[in-house]
């Protein structure tokens, strides 16, 4: 269901107009961004998501809804409703762990996603990195950051190994173990891109876990494991800069200390690796 109302509504207006029998049940949960909530009527729950990024165009939020509308129930929650500034999606009952599933399970989930039809829009990291630079706190801009950004822009993004629909925010809190298996939530950054970029961006604990995931995926996708790992390593500098820039971006938007700590740690990792 999609509304044609062009003016963003408040949460209370959304509830009274479209979900009059529902009431807020949980203010925040795993996989929910700022301003989102769970609403409930008796035992039925729905996730109500708000477009929370003031610097992102409304089209990005609509893409999020369209991605969910295209994906099968074996991968993601169903998209239920859209109006400018808000969407409602199915609430997935299950268990969320901060740790990733084992390599074979996660590889199977990602391979299943990458077998789906493409979304229709490409993920472009270079303009996104430039946006993070321009939108961050000016006091946080450093010559090191600028040098790394210009070097990546000069080199250009790696040539894709295989193009597929990507989730691009795979970590334990965005994976729900339901009675029917693993599902991914929070598709805010989804788009089409290289499968190796997806694998490079997974929030792993260390290189050993990363190699296990890459090897499990290569076996399932029938790709040479060494070739896949080389491609993942080509994307690695882009992913680290993406994470550092995103932490800076969110620090500027929210002022939350967790983001500045994460940004500082990511910059330290980059400097150590030269």
UniProtKB/Swiss-Prot annotation:
<keyword id="KW-0418">Kinase</keyword>
<dbReference type="Pfam" id="PF01636">
    <property type="entry name" value="APH"/>
</dbReference>
<dbReference type="InterPro" id="IPR014093">
    <property type="entry name" value="Thiamine_kinase"/>
</dbReference>
<keyword id="KW-0067">ATP-binding</keyword>
<comment type="similarity">
    <text>Belongs to the thiamine kinase family.</text>
</comment>
<dbReference type="InterPro" id="IPR011009">
    <property type="entry name" value="Kinase-like_dom_sf"/>
</dbReference>
<keyword id="KW-0808">Transferase</keyword>
<comment type="function">
    <text>Catalyzes the ATP-dependent phosphorylation of thiamine to thiamine phosphate. Is involved in thiamine salvage.</text>
</comment>
<dbReference type="InterPro" id="IPR002575">
    <property type="entry name" value="Aminoglycoside_PTrfase"/>
</dbReference>
<keyword id="KW-0547">Nucleotide-binding</keyword>
<dbReference type="GO" id="GO:0019165">
    <property type="term" value="F:thiamine kinase activity"/>
</dbReference>
<dbReference type="GO" id="GO:0006772">
    <property type="term" value="P:thiamine metabolic process"/>
</dbReference>
<comment type="pathway">
    <text>Cofactor biosynthesis; thiamine diphosphate biosynthesis; thiamine phosphate from thiamine: step 1/1.</text>
</comment>
<dbReference type="GO" id="GO:0009229">
    <property type="term" value="P:thiamine diphosphate biosynthetic process"/>
</dbReference>
<protein>
    <recommendedName>
        <fullName>Thiamine kinase</fullName>
        <ecNumber>2.7.1.89</ecNumber>
    </recommendedName>
</protein>
<dbReference type="GO" id="GO:0005524">
    <property type="term" value="F:ATP binding"/>
</dbReference>
């Amino acid at each position: 269901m999609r509304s044609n109302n062009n003016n963003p509504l408040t949460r209370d207006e959304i509830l009274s107009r479209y979900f009059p029998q529902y009431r807020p049940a949980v203010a925040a949960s795993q996989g929910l961004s700022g301003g989102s909530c769970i609403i409930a009527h008796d035992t039925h729950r729905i996730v109500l998501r708000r477009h929370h990024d003031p610097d992102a165009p409304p089209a990005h939020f609509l893409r999020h809804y369209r991605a969910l509308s295209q994906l099968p129930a074996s991968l993601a929650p169903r998209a239920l409703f859209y109006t400018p500034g808000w969407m409602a999606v199915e609430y997935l009952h299950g268990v969320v762990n901060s740790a990733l599933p084992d390599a074979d399970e996660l590889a199977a989930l990602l391979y299943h996603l990458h077998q789906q039809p493409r979304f229709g829009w490409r993920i472009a990291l270079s303009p996104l990195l430039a946006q993070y630079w321009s939108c961050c706190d000016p006091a946080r801009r450093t010559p090191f950051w600028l040098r790394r950004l210009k070097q990546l822009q000069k080199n250009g993004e790696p040539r894709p190994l295989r193009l597929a629909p990507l989730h691009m925010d795979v970590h334990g809190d965005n994976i729900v173990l339901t009675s029917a298996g693993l599902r991914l939530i929070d598709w805010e950054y989804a788009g089409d891109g290289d499968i190796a970029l997806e694998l490079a961006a997974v929030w792993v604990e260390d290189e050993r876990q990363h190699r296990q995931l890459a090897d499990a995926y290569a076996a399932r996708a029938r790709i040479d494991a060494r070739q896949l790992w080389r491609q993942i390593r080509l994307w690695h500098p882009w992913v680290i800069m993406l994470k550092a820039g995103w932490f800076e971006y969110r620090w500027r938007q929210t002022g939350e200390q967790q983001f500045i700590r994460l940004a500082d740690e990511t910059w330290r990792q980059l400097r150590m690796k030269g």
